[in-house]
A protein has these predicted regions:
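N-terminal Rossmann-like NAD(P)+-binding subdomain of aldehyde/semialdehyde dehydrogenases
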Residues: 1-117
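ALDH superfamily catalytic-core signature
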Residues: 3, 7, 46-49, 133-137, ...
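A structured beta-alpha segment of the ubiquitous adenosine-cofactor-binding alpha/beta core
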Residues: 78, 82, 95, 113, ...
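Conserved small-residue-rich beta-alpha loop and adjacent elements
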Residues: 91, 95-175, 179, 224-228
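Short, structured coil segments at secondary-structure junctions
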Residues: 149, 203-204, 223-224, 290, ...
Length: 437
């Protein structure tokens, strides 16, 4: 463990780890009950009033930061917490509570020899450190997944959501205490220095989850020896193949971009090829009507002069706003090459009625989510039926895509014997049976 970690943060982490062990050993129904209790608490008028009042204070303070130019207006959209968002979070908690418990599940049982049985059994990762952006609803999602899987969690939200996070953390602590569990299983850290301190807790913290800007994620990865789960960018593509249906293309483009422009799974680049002009025309018309600023290549602008010229860095930009880059490609091979070079391995989609082209796209694009005739916005733990997500990972290890319950578990090997020793096996000795049970 690095000496950078503060004494307070180290003590908080050790206390959280101990609380997490008790949570891990609690009956599955207790962990599921915690989530139901939390969902019910968030539906109480008094709790909602306190949470919304705290959120209003955060938003009011953020307006001053926007005026000073120290905060983006798009960040405030993520910060806002309303009844609809809270209801969605509660639904996710109920969905998680209803899932079969995955902790302690035997995923392999093998006889090595008569009376020597090997089992692979799922277990929690242990203690997570989660650093997340402005969205206060993310705190509840993260805590819900951690509690359901028997993990403890250190939470560090952004300064802009400080009041909201305090209010939500208080609800979580009340629910844990009411069940007779240690509220330190979910610790809210507020000092900016705590981030560096948590990153230095290798040997205590088992996983870091980083949710924020590309620059921030790169900083986290470079500053810790703890495994990091994150996505560094959300540059998602929608590719209009020549066999794309215009009406479908337009609907997918608008939903992918405008249902929530600040989301990491929002569309950032629209690709089209010769033969897809009708789909392009319908898509751009619908996007313009939805208030999207279009930035295009020369070929796109030749067909649609109202489109603004795309700067050199357009294809590598995650706008997080109602702005979209549009580029013509020669064919599917150039589309694949563009996505390989400029994509972030998050989510990319093809629009086509050609099954061969769809299959090629689905097998060739190396992203966490690869879609055919579907909006990029489906890349979400709740929509995948995971109940919630701790984040979206563009890594290939240990989890990929929306990270739900499975991504917060690892496994142990349990061996049941009757005094066997390795010296009994080998040349001239006993033979392993290696029979799956």
């Amino acid at each position: 463990m690095s000496e950078v970690a503060s004494t307070f943060t180290q003590e908080a982490a050790l206390a959280a780890k101990a609380a997490g062990a008790a949570l891990r050993d609690a009956p599955p129904e207790t962990r599921a009950g915690l989530l139901r209790d939390l969902a019910e608490a968030l539906a109480r008028p008094a709790v909602q009033a306190a949470v919304f009042a705290a959120n209003a204070r955060d938003i009011e303070r953020s307006k001053g930061d926007i005026a000073k130019g120290t905060m983006s207006p798009d960040l405030v959209k993520r910060l806002a917490l309303d009844a609809k968002k809270l209801a969605a979070v509660s639904d996710g908690l109920q969905q998680l509570a209803a899932m079969s418990d995955l902790v302690g599940r035997v995923t392999l049982r093998r006889e090595l020899d008569d009376g020597l049985i090997l089992e692979r059994v799922t277990c929690p990762l242990g203690l997570m450190g989660v650093v997340f952006e402005a969205r206060p609803d993310a705190l509840v999602q993260i805590v819900g997944l951690a509690l359901r899987t028997g993990n403890a969690v250190l939470l560090k939200g952004g300064r802009e959501a400080q009041e909201s996070n305090r209010a939500l953390a208080a609800v979580v602590h009340d629910v844990l205490s009411a069940r007779g569990l240690d509220p330190r299983a979910a610790v809210l850290l507020e000092d900016r220095a705590d981030v560096s301190a948590v990153l230095a807790l290798d040997g205590i913290v088992d996983l870091i989850v980083a949710r924020g800007s590309s620059e921030f994620v790169r900083h986290v990865r470079a500053s810790t020896r703890i495994p990091v789960m994150a996505h560094a960018a959300g540059i998602c593509h929608l590719y209009l193949h020549r066999a794309a249906q215009p009406a479908m293309a337009a609907r997918l483009a608008v939903d992918s971009k405008m249902s929530y422009p600040a989301a990491c799974n929002a569309l950032e680049t629209l690709l089209w090829e010769p033969g897809a002009e009708a789909a392009l025309d319908a898509s751009l018309q619908a996007l313009l009507a939805s208030g999207v600023e279009l930035r295009g290549c020369p070929e796109t602008r030749a067909r649609h002069p109202h489109v603004v010229a795309a700067p050199d860095d357009a294809w590598d930009t995650e706008y997080g706003a109602p702005i979209l880059s549009v580029r013509r490609v020669r064919d599917i091979d150039e589309a694949l090459a563009h996505i390989e070079r400029h994509g972030s391995r998050h989510t990319d989609s093809i629009v086509t009625e050609d099954a061969v082209a769809a299959r090629k796209f689905l097998t060739s694009v190396d992203s966490a989510g690869v879609y055919h005739n579907a909006s990029t916005r489906f890349s979400d733990g709740y929509r995948y039926g995971l109940g919630a997500e701790v984040g979206i990972s563009t890594d290939k290890l240990h989890a990929r895509g929306p990270v739900g319950v499975d991504g917060l578990l690892t496994y142990r090997w349990l061996l049941h014997g009757h005094g066997q020793v390795t010296a009994d096996y080998g040349v001239g000795g006993k033979r392993f049976t290696h029979r799956d049970l």
